[in-house]
Amino acid sequence: MALKSFNPITPSLRELVQVDRTSLWKGRPFKALTKGISKTGGRNNQGRITSWQRGGGHKRLYRVIDFKRNKLDISAIVERIEYDPNRTAFIALIKYEDGEHAYILAPQKLVVGDKIISSKDADIKIGNCLPLRYIPIGTTLHNVEMKVGKGGQIARSAGTSVDLVGKDSGYAQIKLKSGEFRLVPLDCMATIGTVSNPDQKNINLGKAGRNRWLGWRPHVRGVAMNPVDHPHGGGEGKTSGGRHPVTPWGFPTKGKKTRKNKRTSKFIIKKRK
């Protein structure tokens, strides 16, 4: 997909850069694979704000994506490639030989009419899904499971992928885009290829209102608040905070490591950069 810029006939169009989506499906989503999704506005079940700067945004339909790809040894045809407002990647509607439909993450270079399959005997071809045990070292993958049967969790965002760099003692070694090397059980499923829409990282929203459409509210700096609202607040005139950057609750931020899950640290061979 190419990027699209605009003539500056309005101020917001001057900086606007979008992904050209003219080749995507222009109709409604497949109704049987959609369901309603309610907005939280950043509030939890007690009505308290747990995620700042969230709220509003355009109403969305949730597309049910098959991250497990566990319909084995039945080939499917790609019927169309669609936009999904709930994620940065594009999605593909596929139809199996038995008539069942499903949405999957669309990898790059997958086109309408392609035939894909989930099977341990599948060819190493874009869109096919196999257990890591049967994938050759050096293959580029996405939608990789971390637990057998749980569904893909690694490399699902636009333009992302992982590299299979080794196999040993029942585990596959994968290299993530972050530079992290990780162990994953060999029976976990993974899909061949890189996730679609790699130009997502180059877009420019052009105006604040476009962020509001996506459900993001203004981000207020701590130094612009009062002392009652933030540790950086207050002071006479414009002050720079006077301490190392912290969250509204006083915890160090901007680079402070927050990973707490020591239980799975044994699966990380090399930490991310």
UniProtKB/Swiss-Prot annotation:
<feature type="region of interest" description="Disordered">
    <location>
        <begin position="228"/>
        <end position="273"/>
    </location>
</feature>
<dbReference type="InterPro" id="IPR002171">
    <property type="entry name" value="Ribosomal_uL2"/>
</dbReference>
<dbReference type="InterPro" id="IPR014726">
    <property type="entry name" value="Ribosomal_uL2_dom3"/>
</dbReference>
<dbReference type="GO" id="GO:0016740">
    <property type="term" value="F:transferase activity"/>
</dbReference>
<dbReference type="InterPro" id="IPR022671">
    <property type="entry name" value="Ribosomal_uL2_CS"/>
</dbReference>
<keyword id="KW-0687">Ribonucleoprotein</keyword>
<dbReference type="InterPro" id="IPR022669">
    <property type="entry name" value="Ribosomal_uL2_C"/>
</dbReference>
<dbReference type="InterPro" id="IPR005880">
    <property type="entry name" value="Ribosomal_uL2_bac/org-type"/>
</dbReference>
<dbReference type="InterPro" id="IPR008991">
    <property type="entry name" value="Translation_prot_SH3-like_sf"/>
</dbReference>
<comment type="function">
    <text>One of the primary rRNA binding proteins. Required for association of the 30S and 50S subunits to form the 70S ribosome, for tRNA binding and peptide bond formation. It has been suggested to have peptidyltransferase activity; this is somewhat controversial. Makes several contacts with the 16S rRNA in the 70S ribosome.</text>
</comment>
<dbReference type="GO" id="GO:0019843">
    <property type="term" value="F:rRNA binding"/>
</dbReference>
<comment type="subunit">
    <text>Part of the 50S ribosomal subunit. Forms a bridge to the 30S subunit in the 70S ribosome.</text>
</comment>
<dbReference type="InterPro" id="IPR014722">
    <property type="entry name" value="Rib_uL2_dom2"/>
</dbReference>
<comment type="similarity">
    <text>Belongs to the universal ribosomal protein uL2 family.</text>
</comment>
<dbReference type="GO" id="GO:0006412">
    <property type="term" value="P:translation"/>
</dbReference>
<dbReference type="GO" id="GO:0003735">
    <property type="term" value="F:structural constituent of ribosome"/>
</dbReference>
<dbReference type="InterPro" id="IPR022666">
    <property type="entry name" value="Ribosomal_uL2_RNA-bd_dom"/>
</dbReference>
<keyword id="KW-0699">rRNA-binding</keyword>
<dbReference type="GO" id="GO:0015934">
    <property type="term" value="C:large ribosomal subunit"/>
</dbReference>
<dbReference type="Pfam" id="PF00181">
    <property type="entry name" value="Ribosomal_L2"/>
</dbReference>
<keyword id="KW-0694">RNA-binding</keyword>
<keyword id="KW-0689">Ribosomal protein</keyword>
<dbReference type="InterPro" id="IPR012340">
    <property type="entry name" value="NA-bd_OB-fold"/>
</dbReference>
<feature type="compositionally biased region" description="Basic residues">
    <location>
        <begin position="254"/>
        <end position="273"/>
    </location>
</feature>
<protein>
    <recommendedName>
        <fullName>Large ribosomal subunit protein uL2</fullName>
    </recommendedName>
</protein>
<dbReference type="Pfam" id="PF03947">
    <property type="entry name" value="Ribosomal_L2_C"/>
</dbReference>
